[in-house]
UniProtKB/Swiss-Prot annotation:
SUPFAM superfamilies: Anticodon-binding domain of a subclass of class I aminoacyl-tRNA synthetases, Methionyl-tRNA synthetase (MetRS), Zn-domain, Nucleic acid-binding proteins, Nucleotidylyl transferase. InterPro entries: aa-tRNA-synth_I_CS, Anticodon_Met, Met-tRNA-synth_bsu_C, Met-tRNA_ligase_1, Met-tRNA_synth, Methionyl/Leucyl_tRNA_Synth, MetRS_core, MetRS_Zn. This is Methionine--tRNA ligase. It is found in: Cytoplasm. It catalyses: tRNA(Met) + L-methionine + ATP = L-methionyl-tRNA(Met) + AMP + diphosphate. The gene is metG.
Length: 726
C-alpha cells in the first residue's frame, strides 16, 4: 500500500480572474488534501499559475502590457482569491519559477536522447499583416469536428484536440484578417512510439478503476482513433526556449511545459523532491482537473514521463469534473454574467458557505447549473436548518441546564452502531473522491442527531430524568465533535469555530471518531450562520445577470445618440395662432436665430393660453423631420416634462436663464468644448430613445446634465422637478 498522497490541481492560466466554475478543481483538491491529513497520511498539495504560452501573450497584447507584468498581476489575483477561500496549498507557485526552465529542458533532452522527438516541416498559418507565424491560440475558426467557434488548440464544445490548420474559416485574432499557409519547422513528440507502454499503463489504471467513467471514456476514444505525433514547439517569444540547434528562436508549447510545472513548483519548497516525484512505489499521484484537461493528464504528461525512461511517479487517481455553469448563461466578465472569485468576496457571504454549496453540487458526473434560488434554499435548509441548528440547539441547551463541564460517559451502543456505519461510508466516499456523497453523508449524520433531539424531547425530561437527559445530550455533544472533524475538509473555518466551543481540546484526526475522548468543557457557543434573505439573493441575481451591463450599454448608447444625432435649440415664440380645423393645436412662429425662423405645431391649447407663451423662450428638437398636422407643416417639436400623474409643463428657458438668445444649442455637459456635429433629420422615435429625464429639477441623460452651449447654464424643469421629457 502506498504511503504518501501527492495531490495536484490543474494549473490555472494567469490570463483571467477565476470564476466559480474554475474554483471547482482547487477546492476539490483542497478537500481531499485535508481529508488525507485528517487520516494521518503524509500529504503534499501542489498548485500554481500556468504562465507561459499564447494565452498569456495574447492577453498581454490586449491589456497593452508585457507578459511578465501580466503574470505578476494575475498571479496575485489568483493567490488572494484562493487565500480568501481558505485553500491550504503546501505551495502555490508559478511556472516562471527558477527551476522550471531546467526541468522542462532536461525532460525534453531525455526524450530526444531516447528517440521520442521527431522533426517535421509543416504548414502553419502566417499573418501577412502582423508578419508572424500564428500559434494555435492566435487563430480562431470553426471546429472541423462539431462546427463550434473555437481557438486553434482545443475545442471547448467537444473537447477535441485540434490541429490548427484544420480550422474552418480561420482568422488572426490580432488583426482579424485571413492568414495564409506558410512552411515552417517544428519538433514533435512521437506518441505512436510510446503507444505500447502508454496503453499497458492505462490498462492497469482502468482495471483498478482509479479514474472516473468520463476520463476513461475520453482517453480510450482518443487511443482508439490512433495516436499521432504531436507538436511540442511554437513560434512565440514568451515561453521556455528549446535547447536544440536551429530551434533557438522557438519555445515549448504550453501543453508540454505546464504539467511539468507540478514538478518544478515542488522543487521550490522540497529539497528531496524526488521522494515525491520519483517514488512510484510509495506515492499516490492524485490529480484534480476539469474535463477539458483530461487528455493532457492521461495521455500527454504520462507520455513525457514514460518516454524519459526514468522512475517518475505516475498518475494513480484522476478526479475529473464536469462544468459548473451559471443560471443557464456563460460565465463572462465582459458581459457581466456569472460570479467570479473577486465578486464572491464582495457579497458578504462567508467563504465556508460558498465552499459548502460548491461541494454540495460538485459536478462529478454531469454539468451543474449554479442557481441563486437553489443556493439560498440549500444554505438555509441544509447548512443552517440542519447542520448549524443541531450544534446550536444541543450546546445551548446543555450549557443552560447542565453547565460547562462535559462528563466522560459510556457511549450509547445502539446510537453509535448506527453512526459508526455512517462514518465508514463517509470515509469511503472521501477515499473514492466522491466528495459530494461524503458531504451529504455528513448531513445525514447531522439529521440523525436532530431527529434524536426532537424525538427524545429533552426540554420535557430534564427535570424528571436529569441523568438520562444529560447522557442523551453528551452523546450528541460527542457527535458534534465528530461532525466538526468530518466537516473540516469542506468547511475548515466552521470546523475551527466548533472546536473553539470546546477550547480546541482535540485535533482534526479520525482517531477521535466514535470515541469519548478529547472533550472536557463547553467554553462558549454561538450561532454559526445567519439565514440568507431573499432580498440579498434577488440583488445578487440582478447584479450578475448581465442586465446591469445591458443597462450600462443602453446608457452609453443614449449618450452617444444624443451627442451624435439630436440637436436641441432655444427659440423665442413670436406669434401663436390656432388651427382653424383643430382648436387644440397651436401654430407657433419661432425665432431660432436665423432669418427664416421656424414653425411648429403643438397640441398644448389645453394647457396654456397664447398670452402665457408669446415672448417666452422654449427648447425644440431642431432636426426633427418635417411633418403635417391637419394640413399645417411643423418643423420641430417643443420639449416638456410630464410626471407620473400626467402633469405637463413646457421647459421655459427664462426659468433658469436671464435674457436668453434664440438659436443657442443645448448640449450634454460632457460635450463641453467638443466640436459638435450638425446631425441629419430624425423621427420622433429616435429622439425618445435618448431618454431625457428631469431629476430634482435638472434635465439629464443618465446622470449627465443638459446645458446651454455658450452660457453653460443647466437646463431646468422648475415646475415639475421629476419626470420624463417629451
Amino acid at each position: 500500500m502506498k504511503k504518501k498522497n501527492l495531490i495536484t490541481a490543474a494549473l490555472p492560466y494567469v490570463n483571467n480572474i477565476p470564476h466559480l466554475g474554475n474554483l471547482v478543481q482547487v477546492l476539490s483538491a483542497d478537500a481531499f488534501a485535508r481529508y488525507s491529513r485528517m487520516m494521518g497520511i503524509e500529504t503534499l498539495y501542489v498548485c500554481g499559475t500556468d504562465e507561459y504560452g499564447t494565452a498569456t501573450e495574447t492577453k498581454a497584447l490586449i491589456e497593452k502590457t508585457t507578459p511578465e507584468e501580466l503574470c505578476n498581476k494575475y498571479h496575485a489575483i489568483h493567490k488572494s482569491i484562493y487565500e480568501w477561500f481558505n485553500i491550504k496549498f503546501d505551495i502555490f507557485g508559478r511556472t516562471t519559477n527558477k527551476y522550471h526552465k531546467e526541468t522542462v529542458q532536461d525532460l525534453f533532452l531525455k526524450l530526444d536522447k531516447n528517440g521520442y522527438i521527431t522533426e517535421k516541416e509543416n504548414e502553419q498559418f502566417f499573418c501577412q499583416q502582423d508578419k508572424m507565424f500564428l500559434a494555435d491560440r492566435y487563430v480562431t475558426g470553426e471546429c472541423p469536428n462539431c462546427g463550434n467557434n473555437t481557438k486553434g488548440d482545443q475545442c471547448e464544445n467537444c473537447s477535441n484536440l485540434l490541429v490548427t490548420n484544420e480550422l474552418l474559416n480561420p482568422r488572426c485574432i490580432i488583426c482579424k484578417n485571413i492568414p495564409i499557409i506558410k512552411k515552417t519547422k517544428h519538433l514533435y513528440i512521437d506518441l505512436p512510439k510510446i503507444k505500447n507502454e502508454l496503453e499497458h499503463w492505462i490498462q492497469q489504471i482502468d482495471q483498478n478503476t482509479n479514474w472516473n467513467t468520463n476520463a476513461i471514456k475520453i482517453t480510450n476514444a482518443f487511443l482508439r482513433d490512433g495516436l499521432k505525433e504531436r507538436t511540442i514547439t511554437r513560434d512565440l517569444k514568451w515561453g521556455i526556449p528549446v535547447p536544440k540547434k536551429e530551434y533557438e528562436n522557438k519555445v515549448f508549447y504550453v501543453w508540454f511545459d505546464a504539467p511539468i510545472g507540478y514538478i518544478s513548483i515542488t522543487k521550490e519548497i522540497i529539497k528531496d523532491w524526488e521522494s515525491w516525484w520519483k517514488n512510484n512505489e510509495d506515492t499516490n499521484l492524485i490529480q484534480f482537473i476539469g474535463k477539458d484537461n483530461i487528455l493532457f493528464h492521461t495521455i500527454m504528461f504520462p507520455s513525457i514521463e514514460l518516454g524519459s525512461q526514468e522512475n517518475w511517479t505516475m498518475l494513480n487517481k484522476l478526479a475529473s469534473s464536469e462544468y459548473l455553469n451559471y443560471e443557464n448563461l456563460k460565465f463572462s466578465k465582459s458581459a457581466g454574467t456569472g460570479i467570479f472569485g473577486n465578486d464572491v468576496i464582495t457579497t458578504g457571504i462567508p467563504s465556508d458557505v460558498w465552499r459548502f454549496y460548491i461541494y454540495y453540487n460538485r459536478p462529478e458526473k454531469a454539468d451543474f447549473q449554479f442557481m441563486w434560488d437553489d443556493f439560498m434554499e440549500r444554505i438555509n435548509s441544509e447548512l443552517i436548518g440542519n447542520f448549524s441548528n443541531l450544534i446550536n440547539r444541543v450546546l445551548t441547551f446543555y450549557k443552560k441546564f447542565f453547565g460547562d463541564k462535559i462528563d466522560k460517559i459510556e457511549l450509547n451502543e445502539n446510537f453509535w452502531q448506527i453512526v459508526n456505519i455512517k462514518y465508514e461510508r463517509t470515509i469511503n466516499f472521501f477515499k473514492q473522491i466522491e466528495l459530494k456523497a461524503a458531504l451529504k453523508e455528513i448531513l445525514d449524520i447531522s439529521r440523525i442527531g436532530n431527529k434524536i433531539f426532537q424525538d427524545k424531547e429533552p426540554w420535557k425530561t430534564k427535570n424528571s430524568t436529569p441523568q438520562t437527559t444529560k447522557e442523551l445530550l453528551l452523546n450528541l455533544i460527542y457527535l458534534i465533535r465528530d461532525l466538526s472533524i468530518l466537516i473540516s475538509p469542506f468547511m475548515p473555518h466552521t470546523s475551527d469555530r466548533i472546536r473553539s466551543f470546546f477550547g480546541k481540546s482535540y485535533e482534526i484526526s479520525n482517531k477521535f471518531l466514535g470515541t469519548n475522548l478529547g472533550l472536557t468543557t463547553i467554553q462558549s457557543t454561538e450561532v454559526l450562520f445567519t439565514k440568507i434573505e431573499k432580498q440579498l439573493i434577488d440583488s445578487l441575481k440582478l447584479k450578475y445577470s448581465g442586465r446591469t451591463n445591458m443597462q450600462d450599454e443602453q446608457n452609453k448608447n443614449s449618450i452617444n445618440l444624443f451627442s451624435e444625432q439630436i440637436c436641441l435649440k432655444t427659440v423665442k415664440i413670436k406669434t401663436i395662432d390656432r388651427n382653424p380645423d383643430a382648436e387644440k393645436l397651436f401654430i407657433l412662429k419661432l425665432d431660432d436665430g436665423t432669418p427664416e425662423g421656424k414653425q411648429i405645431v403643438s397640441s398644448i391649447a389645453d394647457h396654456y393660453t397664447e398670452e402665457e407663451l408669446i415672448g417666452k423662450h422654449i427648447i425644440i428638437v431642431d432636426n426633427l423631420k418635417p411633418a403635417k398636422f391637419r394640413g399645417i407643416r411643423s418643423e420641430g417639436m417643443l420639449i416638456a416634462t410630464e410626471d407620473e400623474n400626467k402633469n405637463f409643463k413646457i421647459i421655459i428657458v427664462e426659468d433658469f436663464k436671464d435674457n436668453p438668445i434664440p438659436g443657442e444649442r443645448v448640449i450634454l455637459e460632457s460635450d463641453t468644448g467638443k466640436e459638435l456635429k450638425s446631425p441629419t433629420k430624425i423621427n420622433i422615435d429616435k429622439f425618445l430613445q435618448a431618454q431625457i429625464v428631469a431629476e430634482n429639477g435638472e434635465l439629464k441623460i443618465n446622470g449627465i446634465n443638459l446645458i446651454l452651449e455658450h452660457s453653460k447654464e443647466k437646463v431646468l424643469s422648475k415646475e415639475i422637478p421629476n419626470g420624463k421629457i417629451y
